[in-house]
Every structure is written in structure tokens, then in C-alpha cells.
């Protein structure tokens, strides 16, 4: 159970409208031993590299999935393999497109909580592209390059619209390791919405140029997620690793670092 001091501290950083219901639920979840981190499009598992040490110092076992990005089924299978190796309650975390992956895979009984980091959060069977089209089109979409059945983000769009608040040399390194996604991947519909049955947290990036911030707020509200907002680009896990780690620790029932 969260201490009164920690409870008050959490209230200070979480939007009041969404925080109170989420906090009530969060106090009843088991304390997690493990965290599984799932990356999204235009990235790989190394995008979590600055978040991981905070979690490890708190005593959590951390696994970062390397998604093939060849199909939703393949990505979900990679996440399920990671979950299968955990030995107890596990917080499942997804950034960006990985919100789709954790929504599909998150009904695993080991998953004690879900954390969405500037992420998609589709309902089961939902046409997420149609939902996203009801919000302003993000700038990064103009920089997508397609070739031979796969797509990635061009360098200019990556540096400006995906990782705009990252030191340029670091952003170029992230650009170099980005995964290539299969053309059909973003439009694949899920069959499950784990956020409907699992305690859920969400982080909104207010300066996001890859997913519209208002769409992120809509998703967080729809999920009744405990929500924080950061003045960040889409890659908040890189520009604000401590804040993201603290959110994950709260979902795991641990004190922030």
C-alpha cells in the first residue's frame, strides 16, 4: 500500500481529473518484481537504456524486448516470450506503437499493471487509424519513407519531429538504430484490450509531433489511466528517463528514485 507521503507526492504530479480513480485502483495491485519494456516504431530496445538503471537500482528485474516489427503477431510473440521468462508480478510498459503490443499481450496473468508512454492504446478490433484521423495529423507522418514493403522515418523528420528535444548527436545515434516496420503493421487491429482489465498508467508528451497530444489525452481518459504530462517530444523515455522510471516504479508499487 502506498504511504501517505508517497500518495501526496503522486497527487502533485498527476492531473487531478484522471488521477483519483487510478490511484484507488493502484493501491490494490501486487508489488511487482519485474518490468518488461517494449519499444515502438522508429526505435529498438536501446531506447530504454537511460530508464533501465533507475529500475534496476530499485531492485526490479528488467527485460527490454527487441521487436522484429514484421507483424503485430510477431511483435506480440516477442513480448509474450519475455513475459514467459518472468517469475512473478510484472509491469508491462509500451512506448509509441508498443501500446498496441501491450494492449494485445497484456492479459497475461503475470502482468500486474500496464504503463503507456506516449503510446497508442487501441480498443479490441478498433480501426486505430480512423480514430487518429479525427485528430490533427502529426508532423512526423510527412517524413515516413517506404521501400520494398517496409517503412522508416527519414533523418530530418526523426531529428525534428520524433526526437526534437534530444541532443543532436544522441538523436542521430537513435536514428541509426531505428527498426524498419512492415507496411501492414500499423493498420493491424488487435483482438484484446488489456487496459480494460488491468491497472493502467499513461504519460502524455505535450510537445509530441509523432502522436498528437490531444489523442494521447483522449486515450488516457478513455482508459481511466493514472496520467502524468511531460513537456517532451515523442521520446520522453530518452529526454525524461527519471520521470518515466518513477511512473513505472509507482505502477510497480515501489518508491520513486
Where are these regions (language model features)?
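Flexible "cap/lid" loop of the alpha/beta hydrolase fold
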Residues: 107-111, 115-155, 182-185
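Bacterial N-terminal signal peptides that target proteins for export
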Residues: 1-10
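Active-site glycine-rich loops that stabilize anionic/oxyanionic intermediates
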Residues: 40-43, 96-97, 120
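Gly/Ala-rich beta-loop-alpha elbow adjacent to hydrolase catalytic centers
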Residues: 93-98, 102
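Active-site catalytic motif of lipid deacylating hydrolases and related acyltransferases
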Residues: 29-88, 138
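Conserved serine/cysteine hydrolase catalytic core
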Residues: 75, 180-242, 246
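Bacterial N-terminal signal peptides
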Residues: 9-19
